[in-house]
């Protein structure tokens, strides 16, 4: 699991409890893969992209290319600025 530089930068602006949830999500992505239906408002955005809410105001978006082991978290930030 890889966090892009822009996602890491936005994550630093999150409240501590939300950052802890992001770390938990990253751990679960590492263990279980890109499908995370137990997370709040989880949905598949496209064939290879997914998102969930870390809290009411904060979301994470990630992608996993077919036949790839890499999961890239490309957005972790406010819901208002989410790229979907």
What are these regions (language model features)?
Residues 2-5, 9-13, 17, 50-84:
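Enriched for short, Lys/Arg-rich terminal
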């Amino acid at each position: 699991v890889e966090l892009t530089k822009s996602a890491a930068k936005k994550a630093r602006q999150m409240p501590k409890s939300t950052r802890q949830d992001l770390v938990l999500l990253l751990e679960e992505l590492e263990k279980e893969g890109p499908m995370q239906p137990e997370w709040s408002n989880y949905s598949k955005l496209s064939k290879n992209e997914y998102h969930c809410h870390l809290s009411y105001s904060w979301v994470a978006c990630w992608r996993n290319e077919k036949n790839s082991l890499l999961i890239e978290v490309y957005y972790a930030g406010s819901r208002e600025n989410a790229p979907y």
